[in-house]
Amino acid sequence: MACVRQRTKGRVGVDYAYQADGWQAFYGAVAGASAALTGLLFVALSLNSVIVRDAAHRGRAREALSGLLILVVLALIVLIPGQGQRPLGWELLVGGVVLEVFGLRLQAETVTGLPSAHRPRWVTRLVPLHLATLAVPAAGASLLVGRYGGLLWLLPTILVYLIWSTTNAWMLVVQAANEERQ
């Protein structure tokens, strides 16, 4: 993929940030990796039913599974062949707003189930996740106006969601094993 630079009104634009076709291999890898991790996590959660007894464990399980599923769906949306910049922009903008609203609702449900002493720390740990989620509608808006980064906004989302989901999955499996020993 060639990096094409274009000068527009004193700024340098990177055309590939606005063309989904140039990202096919990347999003194919994201979809494949996320789908594989989702399957592994689903099996691990099925084998460790003790996890769903605790509100924090349920919250982590939901975050890990939903984060990976969101990455699969996000990748599939970008991989739709022949899709123009504007339709993709609208899909990301609307989908990202809906995603954030539902995410906040589910996190509020988790927080209310936690002991009050653990709530501030839980809410604080969610800041990177929600900032990464807000990058999805930012990518959509950027595609719609044709400036400010386009699909590059999704890179932090993908990195944060992969790291977040993998870390949560690991913590769940390790904590479940520790609790079974006790």
Task: List PLM regions with ranges.
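Short, strongly hydrophobic alpha-helical membrane anchors
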Residues: 1-25
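Juxtamembrane helix-loop boundaries in multi-pass membrane proteins
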Residues: 15, 22-32, 52-73, 115-133, ...
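Membrane-helix boundary elements
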Residues: 17-21, 70-90, 108
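Alpha-helical transmembrane segments
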Residues: 22-35, 86-100, 153-162
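N-terminal signal-anchor/start-transfer transmembrane helix
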Residues: 31-49
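C-terminal ends of transmembrane helices
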Residues: 44-55, 104-116, 169-175
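Hydrophobic alpha-helical transmembrane segments in multi-pass integral membrane proteins
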Residues: 72-81, 131-147
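Terminal transmembrane helical module of multi-pass membrane proteins
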Residues: 136-182
